[in-house]
Amino acid sequence: MERSTPIRVLVAKPGLDGHDRGAKIIARALRDAGMEVIYTGLRQTPEMIVSAAIQEDVDCIGLSILSGAHNAIVPRVIALLREQQAEDILLVLGGTIPNQDAEGLQRSGVSAIFGPGTPLDTIVEFIRRNVKSRGPLTRVAPLPYESNRP
């Protein structure tokens, strides 16, 4: 069954990371694929991200984290989504995430982790496929992740 409205995705750069080129490339690819994209800009707090996601009624949040702060930021975003009863928002992560951290992040509710060099079509198709089956954060079977970092 086709959606009657475009998928809405919030792309955010949490923490002190100042590199946003990748997030902007992802945002443009999602937009070009027909999705409505809200880009929050640099240095967003988890509170700002969740608040914007709820206000904008998004289907998906994409976090771009290159700073190494994923183990502090992502659990806070998930906790805030749960507090706001917004667990049906699909949560995906992009950036340089070590393999040893990926499994715990996915267990906690991240549906997919996309490392550097992931084809844009892979990201678009994952979001399209999984937004349709929105449910609690842990409902979507995690996409296998393997970083290109040792």
Feature-to-residue mapping (PLM):
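A short, charged, Gly/Pro-tolerant segment at domain boundaries
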Residues: 140-150
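N-terminal pre-triad scaffold of radical SAM enzymes
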Residues: 12-16
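The C-terminal output helix
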Residues: 129-142
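Short, flexible coil/linker segments at domain boundaries that flank nucleotide/cofactor-interacting
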Residues: 2-6, 86
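Cofactor-cradling patches in redox/metallo enzymes
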Residues: 23-128, 132
